[in-house]
Amino acid sequence: MEFSAETLRQQLGKYKFRDLTIEELKDLNRTFPSFIFSMETYTFRDGSQKDLLNLTGTVPMKHQGTTYNIPICLWILDSHPFAPPLCFLKPSGNMGIRVGRHIDAQGRIYLPYLQNWSHPKSTVTGLIREMAVKFEEELPLYSLSAEDGARQRELLSYIAQVTDGVSSMDVKAPSRAKVTVIGGGDMALACLLAVSAKGTAGKLLLLDPTDGEAAGGAAADLEIFSLPNVQVTKDFSAIAGSAIVIVTVNSWSNSQSYVGVLQSNVELLRGILPAVAHHCPKCLLLVASQPVEIMTYATWKLSGFPHNRVLGIGCNLDSGRFRHVIEKLADSEEGAQGAWIIGEQSDNKVAVWGAPDSSANRQTPCKLYPKIFQEQLTSRALEILKGKGQRSWSVGLSVADITDTLVQNKGKVHSVSALCKGQFGVQEEVFLSIPCVLGSAGVTGAVQTLQDEAQIWETLQRSAAAIESVQQQLRL
């Protein structure tokens, strides 16, 4: 390509050593004229972004008498030439990455030349020459067979998400949103740690609304033993910009009646949700407080949000466990995709067989077992799962699973607490767990179950009536 020093000078306006960088790139252009320069957005591991100079091109080399052109991508940091570039392979869909001494599974390139980088001895031109030498010793890429092509395209998408950075020119950078967890107890900490481990959030915030230290043990511990990208606060203004707000607050007292405890929870929400709605008017609310159906309903009413942006964790954990057991019993992952636990998160929940995960990225249809076999599998699976509780850590993993789908806009199906009026013959304004398609807009659709037995409908309708009866006793 034609080299334009003036264009580069304008693009590198924020670079500390712009003139030195331009002179070095002139030399690179003379030696490797096929490299293309462009300013692209680089996403770091912590979710922060910076506009950096991106170089894409090929490294010519020979291996066993055959000439190869290895596609690479270099990111030139704004402290160049005193800091080495970040280097990645850039394989096409029919290429596989060969992990070796200098290449990791994500295509990141590691060379002694980079480790020993020292200006003015080290240059980008010298780096590419070093790559050619090392690539001749060990080819970094290999040709895929046709049947591996589809898997490789998925790999490339994955690589783009887990490497230090990715050019938006090739693959859209994964969303790494700000996520807030509200609460100060074990449930809040479990959700926070699970979401952090999932890697979905660029920034995590724990907002502890409790007064004093008694109820805020988890928050206090996090202030002592801090975690990267995690902020602990009592200031509601700090949650501004959160894409997801996870509600875990609960108030339990042995001296109160059941309705009294629920009313205490409602009052907690009343003191929290107006501030959430003010600072995060576009966020999604994910409720993990118990009982989740009633607390999700109260959150919906008190927040004033559209019902599609308010959901509860529902039976997502139960459904995941149920499908896992079905897979083991039937020795088939494919056959468990249509198995769901729905309804009320209590002894009244029911197992159903419905449509498979209808997300856009699933191409394999669900295997439909004969009804008698479905019943046998269901009975055996529920027997195995009997007595399996919902401890904080397991609920936290379920919350992280849902959060990942919402933030990444996966269009994946989860059994979550959603407004159920008009489905399964339910006429009440209640939230029950049903298979829903989730994305960045919240609940974007519901999956129609294949079973319409009267017994299932009656169970859901009884749950809806009982829940509404309690809701009518609450002051909202």
Curated annotation (Swiss-Prot):
Residues 2-145 form the UEV domain. The keyword NAD applies. GO terms for molecular function: oxidoreductase activity, acting on the CH-OH group of donors, NAD or NADP as acceptor. SUPFAM superfamilies: LDH C-terminal domain-like (SSF56327), NAD(P)-binding Rossmann-fold domains (SSF51735), UBC-like (SSF54495). It holds the Pfam family UEV. Keywords: NAD, Ubl conjugation pathway. In the N-terminal section; belongs to the ubiquitin-conjugating enzyme family. UEV subfamily. In the C-terminal section; belongs to the LDH/MDH superfamily. This is Ubiquitin-conjugating enzyme E2 variant 3. It comes from Xenopus tropicalis.
